[in-house]
A protein has these predicted regions:
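Conserved PDZ fold ligand-binding element
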Residues: 158-181, 296, 303-305
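Hydrophobic membrane-insertion alpha-helices, especially the h-region
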Residues: 11-31
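Terminal peptide-recognition signature
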Residues: 136, 158, 165-168, 197, ...
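Short, glycine/polar-rich helix-capping loops at beta-to-alpha or helix-loop-helix junctions
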Residues: 308-319
Length: 352
């Protein structure tokens, strides 16, 4: 009877061990619909990269860099082509400087990893352009708005002819100054007509003829298969040599301040060690971003003494402990004024 009683006990033990093993494997291997976000890195935009090239290079104007630092801040986040396990999520949740977020809050449902990468690269390109425009305007440099090709349909008649970034000067020999002007000029044609564009591409003027086809939304309306947005023309050439794995829109403010520091009549930053975050529009408005607490942590880790916080993010940092001075900014103009006051020992500087 003792022998027959041992078999259920043995099998119960084995079954329990298997259940525990399966639970452990599930904890380690089964992906869950969350991502982890943690402090990333900072990059001093007034320095050079690992190849010795300036992070931001401005040609065509006299420039300065100074002794100070203007650091952009980043977060590290689970990649779009990777999945977070429950164990990894638990570890991240227990760490004070990490966040665990719903995956769809970061990566739109239905978008492939390749599409997400393309979206983020496009946002970085747009942020670089808008930062340049905002900085040059703030420094008193002339900037002209022009209609610009922002996308070309691979199936449209302009494919291989017009290119994203082309600034449109004329349509059918007549100057155009806005997106609306280009649309009106194309709509004057009938389907099958040829539209002649004069565009500025990489400082070269090109004349390009495109035959219209039927619009997808109205078969009787002519179309050339491009998306037109507002672009900008200015004298200097601005080149970004920021590490290629940094993408997204949130470095706009830091890039704009760095360009302003280089081209403005007077030294803005001096020897200050500044970090910051925030998207920026061409007219200089600062936009709130995600991951503000992680960015504050990484900025302090890398030695920043002042951190520029978008006004829209102040509510996200209540309770954050830091030795840095947190300065609230709503615009590039605000940021410039605050830095000038700090250097002058002034008071009344906005803070979160």
């Amino acid at each position: 009877m003792r022998q027959t009683a041992r078999f259920p006990t043995r099998w119960t033990a084995i079954s329990s061990a298997l259940v525990v093993l399966l639970c452990v494997l599930a904890l380690i291997l089964v992906p869950i619909p969350f991502v982890a976000r943690s402090p990333g890195q900072t990059v001093n935009l007034l320095s050079t990269n690992e190849r010795g090239k300036p992070m931001i290079q401005v040609d065509g104007l006299t420039t300065r860099h100074g002794e100070g630092e203007m650091r952009m801040t980043t977060v590290s986040i689970t990649r779009a082509d990777s999945r977070l396990s429950m164990a990894e999520a638990l570890v991240a949740h227990l760490r004070a400087d990490h966040d665990v977020l719903q995956r769809e809050a970061i990566y739109p449902p239905g978008r492939s990893p390749q599409q997400v990468d393309a979206d983020e690269s496009y946002m970085m390109d747009t942020s670089e352009r808008d930062a340049a425009v905002a900085a040059l305007r703030a420094a008193g440099q002339p900037v002209t708005e022009m209609p610009m090709v922002s996308a070309v349909s691979a199936a449209g008649p302009a494919h291989g002819k017009l290119a994203p970034g082309d600034l449109i000067e004329k349509v059918d020999g007549k100057p155009v100054a806005s997106v609306l002007d280009v649309g009106k000029a194309v709509r004057k044609h009938t389907v099958g007509d040829t539209v002649v564009f004069v565009v500025l591409r990489n400082s070269s003027v090109k004349t390009i003829a495109v035959t219209t086809v039927s619009s997808v939304s109205d078969r009787r309306a002519p179309a050339v298969g491009v998306t037109i947005d507002t672009g900008y023309r200015y004298t200097p050439t601005i080149t970004y040599n920021i590490p290629g794995d940094i993408v997204g829109p949130s470095a706009g403010l830091a890039m704009a301040l760095s360009i302003y520091q280089m081209v403005a009549p007077n030294d803005l930053i001096g020897s200050l060690r500044i970090a910051g975050t925030g998207g920026i529009s061409p007219d200089g408005n600062v936009v709130a971003i995600g991951g503000i607490q992680e960015k504050i942590a990484v900025a302090e880790r890398d030695g920043a003494k002042i951190f520029l916080v978008p006004a829209g993010n102040c509510r996200d940092i209540s309770g954050v402990e830091t030795s840095m001075r947190l300065v609230k900014v709503s615009s590039l103009k605000d940021a410039i004024a605050a830095i000038q006051k700090i250097r002058a020992g002034g008071t009344g500087i906005p803070h979160c």
